[in-house]
């Protein structure tokens, strides 16, 4: 058999730079403003949906405005990307503050920036959060570019970056009839390229590391947490009813300011492989 390939194809797929992160836009707070917003109606046509995917791929998150404040809206958006992922919390979910739940998201307290499901071997790729009702004060949603934290630490604290790239950190969830455990580095690398950030002090489990590495590990954790909680790296916004926040859980750390009052949310997860598939189908890379 004989197969012919164009030079352009060979260069792009074999000879060229195949970095997964070539077109990502790493950001700090003062570098993104209105870039993150897109109207829900724009998602309903192919051109608008591609623009949405580009925002989500490049920045790691975006806010969809003018959504209907019902659970079905979350499902419609998830199904345009892939499908709703089932988890211990169900597929689609609605929630208000609830102290009886084991998960920290159900409280009114401040949530420091973290990624979800560090206790899962395959953490959700995307998370969708729709604000259905807000009669409260506070409760800002917080986004942090974990890839940019990785780049910053690699450039300025290479020894600490290496620690967080090589030590597996365990996560554990106990509740709702399950015990889930998994472990991976905070900075997961593939051929020296950062492909996933996993950081959650709420779900981190006990573990042992070599005594000589203990102090350095906690120094690295402290530096990561300092950067994630500095104003420079945080984008903050109080979600209004009808606004849906969607973000890449393998890249973006999310948090929430403390609040008082009523705040009702709806949401779901989508698998990373389905997000990547949608991007490839629409030529987003």
Regions found by a protein language model. Give the residues of each.
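Hydrophobic, ordered structural segments
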Residues: 1-24
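Active-site environment of non-heme Fe oxygenases that use a 2-His-1-carboxylate facial triad
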Residues: 24-61, 66-285
